[in-house]
Amino acid sequence: MNRESAKQLVLTDRFGRTVDYVRIAVTSACNLRCTYCLKEDAPTQTQQLDVVETSKLIALLAGMGVRKIRFTGGEPLLHPSIPELVRIAKATPGIDTVCITTNGVLLDRQLDALVEAGLDGVNLSLDTLDREKFTSITRRDRFEQVSKALDRLLATPSLTVKLNTLMLRGINNDEIPAFVELTREHDLTVRFMELQPFDDHQIWRTGRFMGAERIRERLADAYPELEAITGHSTEHYSFSLPGHRGSIAIIPAFSRNFCSSCSKLRITADARLISCLYHHESIDLAPALKGEMNEVELKKRIIEAVQQKPKDGLKSSHDTAASSMSQIGG
């Protein structure tokens, strides 16, 4: 199938939303132990997607109308073949954009190979610009590696760069100005994010939750010259500042209202297809990827998952079990 014919196909759910974006967690392994995501003693046994099977899946999804692939984890750079996966995805007819979301620990050493493979964008998860806070949040002393990776990203004009900064009340909310300052000289988007309502709703027990409205108020108080702009569908608030090259966004996770424009599917490292971040019912793709069913049946499973997408993830999440972000893939 050539690129033009692939573009004629569209995946649509029962509410009329087009699904053209798939996040693939290539591994469940992670080299950090962020306090809001993984326990220090989290199991070391991990799942990892096979390159051949993943390539087959990407080609099939592209033929069904998927245009964007994002590799996640766990930590995707722990997958030994991540540059190859990027190259394969980028070369797949119908796929226009290939990105990764990473904690950045291994990014400096792999960045050249990823760019050469055709990577379009990087979302770097970075919650603090302070080394001591970084070690406290992640339980690992890897700040220097991540800081170097950020410098490299900002010096790579071919990449779309976004910082995902999870706001933790009483821990890093005082760093909002420091993160905003990065947008002055650099064409990146700093995205302040609410904690995700997973892990048995631990966010409420810790008292660290900082809502999107409170983040917006802090920004408005500090920067009265903020100008509202149109951002990505998940960026409920998006702003620019006069004299700044980059932009600022706020992403709700609990107080969200962007379900109506959701275009995503998620594939976990054990080959489960999840239609909604908050609705954890899944469809097992492993038998199909291992050749135990034909392509027609695999397509049926994907369409079934698309049709399972709930209209409102918030309502759906009340009735499903909690999972960690490392399991779901972000």
Swiss-Prot record:
Pathway: Cofactor biosynthesis; molybdopterin biosynthesis. It comes from the Bacteria. Coiled coil: none annotated. It catalyses: GTP + AH2 + S-adenosyl-L-methionine = (8S)-3',8-cyclo-7,8-dihydroguanosine 5'-triphosphate + 5'-deoxyadenosine + L-methionine + A + H(+). Its cofactor is [4Fe-4S] cluster. Residues 309-330 are annotated as: Disordered. [4Fe-4S] cluster 1 binds at C30, C34, C37. GO terms for molecular function: 4 iron, 4 sulfur cluster binding; cyclic pyranopterin monophosphate synthase activity; GTP 3',8'-cyclase activity; GTP binding; metal ion binding; S-adenosyl-L-methionine binding. Binds 2 [4Fe-4S] clusters. Binds 1 [4Fe-4S] cluster coordinated with 3 cysteines and an exchangeable S-adenosyl-L-methionine and 1 [4Fe-4S] cluster coordinated with 3 cysteines and the GTP-derived substrate. [4Fe-4S] cluster 2 binds at C259, C262, C276. Keywords: 4Fe-4S, GTP-binding, Iron, Iron-sulfur, Lyase, Metal-binding, Molybdenum cofactor biosynthesis, Nucleotide-binding, S-adenosyl-L-methionine. GTP binds at R23, R70, T101, K162, K264, L265, R266. Pfam families: Fer4_12, Mob_synth_C, Radical_SAM. Residues 319-330 have a biased composition (Polar residues). Residues 309-318 have a biased composition (Basic and acidic residues). GO terms for biological process: Mo-molybdopterin cofactor biosynthetic process. Its EC number is 4.1.99.22. Residues 14-225 form the Radical SAM core domain. It is an enzyme of class 4 (lyase). S-adenosyl-L-methionine binds at Y36, G74, S125. InterPro entries: Aldolase_TIM, Elp3/MiaA/NifB-like_rSAM, MoaA, MoaA_NifB_PqqE_Fe-S-bd_CS, MoaA_twitch, MoCo_biosynth_MoaA/MoaC, rSAM. Monomer and homodimer. Belongs to the radical SAM superfamily. MoaA family. PANTHER family: MOLYBDENUM COFACTOR BIOSYNTHESIS PROTEIN 1, MOLYBDOPTERIN COFACTOR SYNTHESIS PROTEIN A. Catalyzes the cyclization of GTP to (8S)-3',8-cyclo-7,8-dihydroguanosine 5'-triphosphate. This is GTP 3',8-cyclase. It comes from Chlorobaculum tepidum (strain ATCC 49652 / DSM 12025 / NBRC 103806 / TLS). The gene is moaA.
